Regions:
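Short, surface-exposed connector motifs at secondary-structure boundaries
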Residues: 73-75, 99-101, 126-132, 248-253, ...
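Gly-rich Lys/Arg/Thr-decorated short loops/hinges at beta-loop-alpha junctions or inter-strand turns
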Residues: 46, 72-76, 96-102, 216-226, ...
Length: 718
């Protein structure tokens, strides 16, 4: 392969819902560029993308795959992406290096949940969108309905460049209103005839061309003046206006294809090289300090790693985009993210698992390298002495959690190592050990997402694991005032132990004044605050500790021990062993022994006095509540609402959004285990959701009773 200059490079990401036909479109693009001699199929398991065993088993894309084609003296880098929201991390990391996104839409269904979700991510990253309406050869295809759904979801900027003449099982002809030609295709080879538009289609084509001209002119003042002067635009002027509009997301062109029959691929490729921007025409990228950095070959060399993966027999592969300058084989660079030195020993153009060695890559190109020592996803490499660090990619909040445990105890250490490696490949996979719950917790985007990781652990690394229901990080608190005193006394010959502590506990309420007196158990206790310690607890909430000792009944040197005893019990709450929070404790009296009193005595006295007071202070268990936003088709709204209500949710609001219904609800975390699977089952995979932590709230009485009983049984078993 020759070296391509920046102006002859195009970078596209193929987006779309599962089953829309992205992978087969990529096959057709590579076939037209003669990168492959024949097109593969999903059923035959011989596509260039989807080459991993797990993808072939599932017959769908699970990972992003970097590809390329060479077409009319241009290199088009193509990134094929998964269509399931479970693998949104791969979609986002593909959008970053892409300059244009091609949204493949199944003409049987129109806008699907993946179309909507990935469209939002393209919008957030300000990436142009071209719609490729696919599967027009299907007998259930409905182009008009698909177009209408696109306009509902993406607005009036959706503009036809092409429309099908005969969508359905006999589909073989497209009318293009940019070139004002009809293209008729023969078989599935991509061969076509370029014909004049039939008379019976001319009025429709002319009307649509006029709309395209007006939309193109609206994006540029000089073109608008030409349009007013001449009443029309030439084909080249239209391309200029569309190019400007694409960059500004002021136009979303619509193309017609059948990737299965290779219909429309050449026209789409022509549009990509003639209208879509080259990397140097794209808006500047941002560095971590907010500076803008243009893609320019004359600048010092830099690259950004958007994907890291591990391939059998090869090791770690880093996929990158050349952000500036040019990268040459055996080039020494500096990792601006961690200050490490790296040598880019080899450069490759990549098409799935196939790699072609290259001597250099120019600004804007996409390639891969191996054997970097300490460079991962989101890292920047730059020329020595020219430190540049690009802003990291950002990913959605996690929305699925499970506990994970190696079946063989000896694999536990290896398990952590390989999951951390998985996180480097897919930043939406997160693992942590919860000291509180005493579980290894695994977080991701859905059950299917983490099941793929489970398969990889077993089949690639020979680690068999179990997924367990994750425990819930409950909290404990109190709702009323209570008093307790406790004497710790131990005598067994020699020096003994003695400490007595009197305390009052009450709920912490922000802004409430310090205590002066308490009325408790028909007794008035006057308080004189001598010292106050306000502790922001690691697990959330507060502890306010008051020293109210007068007359030296407890020496001040023992107060830290009392506080330590209280904190120990708050770390293992009196009700269920969960963290306690939002409590005020006033130690106002006690007793010492001149010989037997020591720190351990007062720690134990403080711990037990607190425990006893807590249990009579209206103790409550609190549970984490998440705000959940569900995007669901209208016909499934009732089922989803009913399911949410069965999960003890509170519906905050409902709204219509771009052809979907949006439900916002507050749902206990305990009710969200495997929700992604349940939602998929309820809606046949047509809905999605996201969630974020909201607050802790008291559990209902019946739930508290169940939790107390379960904790009691668990304690007996131990």
């Amino acid at each position: 392969m020759k070296t391509y200059s920046t102006d002859h490079i195009r970078n596209i990401a193929l987006l779309g819902n599962t089953g829309s036909g992205k992978t087969i479109l990529a096959e057709s693009m590579m076939f037209e560029g003669k990168v492959i001699e024949r097109r593969g199929t999903i059923d035959a398991k011989n596509t260039v993308s989807d080459y991993t065993e797990i993808e072939q088993q599932n017959q769908r894309s699970i990972f992003s795959t970097v590809l390329y084609t060479e077409y009319k003296d241009h290199k088009i880098n193509i990134i094929d992406t998964p269509g399931s929201d479970d693998f949104v991390g791969a979609v986002i990391s593909s959008l970053y290096p892409a300059d244009v996104s091609i949204m493949v839409v199944n003409s049987q269904y129109g806008v699907e949940v993946g179309t909507e979700i990935f469209g939002r991510h393209a919008e957030r990253l300000h990436k142009p969108i071209i719609f490729a309406v696919n599967q027009l050869d299907h007998d259930k295809s409905n182009f008009d309905q698909t177009l209408e759904s696109l306009k509902v979801s993406f607005g009036s900027k959706v503009t036809l460049v092409q429309y099908p003449v005969n969508a359905g099982s006999d589909f073989n002809a497209i009318i293009d209103v940019l070139t004002m030609k009809m293209y008729r295709y023969k078989g599935d080879t991509g061969e076509r005839e370029e014909l004049d538009i039939p008379a019976e289609e001319m009025d429709k084509a002319a009307e649509l061309q006029n709309t395209l001209i007006e939309t193109a002119a609206e994006n540029d003042e000089s073109l608008m003046e030409m349009f007013f002067d001449k009443g029309t635009l030439t084909e080249d002027e239209m391309r200029q206006g569309i190019r400007i509009g694409l960059l500004a997301r002021g136009i979303f062109p619509v193309f017609c294809i059948s990737s299965k029959r290779n219909i429309g691929t050449k026209r789409l490729l022509d549009f990509i090289i003639n209208v879509c921007p080259s990397p140097d025409k794209m808006p500047a990228s941002k560095t971590i300090d907010g500076k803008e950095f243009k893609c320019n070959v004359s600048e010092p060399a830099s690259l950004f790693v958007f994907k890291t993966s591990v391939e059998p027999h090869i090791g770690e592969i880093n996929y990158f985009k050349v952000m500036s300058g040019k990268i040459t084989e055996a080039m020494d660079m500096v990792n601006s993210t961690n200050d490490g030195k790296e040598r880019v020993s080899q450069l490759f153009a990549v098409a799935g698992k196939n790699r072609q060695k290259l001597p250099e890559l120019m600004a804007g190109d996409i390639g891969a390298t191996v054997k970097l020592k300490n460079t991962k996803t989101n890292h920047t490499l730059s020329a020595p002495g020219k430190s540049i660090q690009f802003a990291s990619m950002t990913f959605p909040n996690i929305k699925y959690r499970t506990a994970i445990k190696a079946k063989n105890e000896s694999d536990t250490e290896k398990l952590g190592e390989y999951i951390n490696r998985a996180h480097q490949e897919d930043p939406t996979i997160i693992v942590e050990y919860s000291k509180e719950l005493k579980q290894i917790l695994l977080f991701g985007q859905g059950e299917h997402h983490l099941n793929i990781l489970k398969w990889q652990l077993l089949n690639l690394y020979k680690i068999d694991v179990d997924f367990l229901a994750p425990k819930i990080p409950y909290r404990e608190t109190i709702t009323k005032l209570a008093q307790s005193d406790y004497r710790h006394k131990k005598q067994s010959g020699g020096a003994g132990q003695f400490g007595e502590v009197h305390m009052v506990v009450e709920p912490y309420i922000e802004g409430a004044p310090d205590p002066k007196k308490y009325n408790v158990n028909n007794k008035e206790i006057n308080i004189s605050v001598r010292g106050k310690e306000e502790i922001n607890l690691e697990w959330g909430g507060k502890l306010i500790f008051y020293n109210c000792i007068v007359g030296g009944s407890i020496d001040t040197r023992f107060l830290p021990a009392i506080l330590k005893g209280i904190m120990e019990k708050m770390e293992e709450g009196p009700l269920t062993g969960s963290y306690a929070r939002d409590i005020k404790v006033a130690v106002y009296d006690g007793k010492m022994h001149p010989v037997d009193s020591n720190e351990i005595s007062f720690k134990l006295a403080g711990r037990n006095a607190f425990k006893n007071a807590f249990k009579i202070a209206g103790p409550k268990i609190m549970e984490p509540i998440y705000e959940v936003e569900v995007l669901v088709p209208s016909d499934k709204m009732g089922d989803v609402m009913s399911d949410l209500q069965n999960r003890r949710s509170i519906i905050l609001g409902m709204d219509s959004e771009k052809g979907f219904e949006k439900i916002i609800a507050r749902v206990p975390l305990a009710e969200l285990h495997k929700y992604s699977t349940a939602l998929s089952s309820l809606t046949s995979g047509r809905a999605t959701y996201n969630m974020k932590f909201s607050s802790y709230e008291q559990v209902p009485a019946d739930v508290q009773d169940k939790l107390l009983k379960a904790y009691e049984e668990e304690s007996e078993d131990e």
